Amino acid sequence: MSASDFEERVVTIPLRDARAEPNHKRADKAMILIREHLAKHFSVDEDAVRLDPSINEAAWARGRANTPSKIRVRAARFEEEGEAIVEAETAE
């Protein structure tokens, strides 16, 4: 794998749009927003984004209705079997 095939960044993802959803759907919407944001900024399909369980735990930490307003994520884009893949985990 060459250096051009691998890219890693720490990204702050705003989740305030999840507040537009009803209380019982906010954490679900936050997970959708995270996947959409990473797909857009790393130029891959949403299906090619793999999220670590730590991101799910951070989005759901305060319950379904009280999602965080933003989340910091460390994401890496690389080539696997000719396709671009993004793997993400929470940044500490």
Swiss-Prot record:
The keyword RNA-binding applies. InterPro entries: Ribosomal_eL31 (IPR000054), Ribosomal_eL31_CS (IPR020052), Ribosomal_eL31_dom_sf (IPR023621). GO terms for biological process: cytoplasmic translation. GO terms for cellular component: cytosolic large ribosomal subunit. The modification N-acetylserine is found at S2. CDD domains: Ribosomal_L31e. Keywords: Acetylation, Ribonucleoprotein, Ribosomal protein, RNA-binding, rRNA-binding. One of its GO terms (molecular function) is rRNA binding. Signal peptide: none annotated. It holds the Pfam family Ribosomal_L31e. Belongs to the eukaryotic ribosomal protein eL31 family. Part of the 50S ribosomal subunit. Binds to the 23S rRNA. Located at the polypeptide exit tunnel on the outside of the subunit. This is Large ribosomal subunit protein eL31. It comes from Haloarcula marismortui (strain ATCC 43049 / DSM 3752 / JCM 8966 / VKM B-1809).
